Amino acid sequence: MTGENTGDNPRRVLLKLSGEAFGGGKVGIDTTVVRRIAEEIVPAVKQGVQVAIVVGGGNFFRGAELQQAGIDRSRGDYMGMLGTVMNCLALQDFLEQEGQATRVQTAITMGQVAEPYIPLKAIRHLEKGRVVIFGAGAGMPYFSTDTVSIQRSLEIHCDEVLMGKNGVDGVYTADPRKDENAKRFATLSYNRALVDNLAVMDAAALSMARDNKQRIRVFGLEGAGNVTQALLGEEIGTMVSTAESTLAE
C-alpha cells in the first residue's frame, strides 16, 4: 500500500512514540533503537506519506513520578517536557543522517534548537515532504503526550494517530503478559476501550479522540518493519475507532 489516499490528498499521519521506546527500557537514549525507528520512517515518507511525530520524555523524567519524590508536579512536568526535546533532537539527527529533511517544533520557545509550534507552518513542512517532530508536550503541565498527540493530529488534519507500543502488538482483552488467554482486538470501539479501561492511552486523550472521531492504530514497535507498515496504512495491531469491537483471528 502506498502513501496515497483514495482521494487526491496524500496520507497524513501522526506517529506517537513513547520516551521509554527511545531509552530501550533504561534512562537516556538508546541510539540503536532510535536509529532503527528513523530508518523505518524514511521509506514511508518516500512513498508519499506525510509524517508528523510526537515524542514522550519518560526515558528522562515523568512529572507524576517526580511528584512522588517531593518535586512540585508542575515543575516536574516541565522537566519532562525538556526531556521530550532531547528525544526530538536525537530522532531529527538520525532522520537527517538518512537524508530525510526534518523539522522540530516545540510548545516551549527555544529558538536555538527548534521552531515554535505553528500548525500552519507544520502543515507546510509536511506538504514539502519534511518530517515534523513535536516536542515539549503541550507547553503546559498536567497534559500527557498522549493528549498532545490527539490534539496535534486534529489541528494539522491527520488521517489517524499511530501509537507505537513496547512489549505488545496491539490492544488485548487483558494483559497478555499476565493472562495467557488474552485475545488481541483487530478493531476496538472508543467506548469499549474507555469502559474496560484498556491500555490504549490515557482516558483524557481517548475521550478527545472519540469526541472528534480520530482513528488510532495501536501497534508493536519491536517487529522489524512495523513502523513502516503502520505509516503506510497496513492493517497491523488494533484499530480504535467508531467501529464495533472485533477480535483478531
Curated annotation (Swiss-Prot):
One of its GO terms (cellular component) is cytoplasm. SUPFAM superfamilies: Carbamate kinase-like. Keywords: ATP-binding, Cytoplasm, Kinase, Nucleotide-binding, Pyrimidine biosynthesis, Transferase. The keyword ATP-binding applies. ATP binds at K16, L17, S18, G19, G58, R62, N166, Y172, D175. It comes from the Bacteria. Inhibited by UTP. CDD domains: AAK_UMPK-PyrH-Ec. Pathway: Pyrimidine metabolism; CTP biosynthesis via de novo pathway; UDP from UMP (UMPK route): step 1/1. GO terms for molecular function: ATP binding; UMP kinase activity. It holds the Pfam family AA_kinase. It catalyses: UMP + ATP = UDP + ADP. Its EC number is 2.7.4.22. Its main location: cytoplasm. GO terms for biological process: 'de novo' CTP biosynthetic process; UDP biosynthetic process. UMP binds at G57, D77, A138, G139, M140, P141, Y142, F143, S144, T145. It is found in: Cytoplasm. Homohexamer. Belongs to the UMP kinase family. Catalyzes the reversible phosphorylation of UMP to UDP. This is Uridylate kinase.
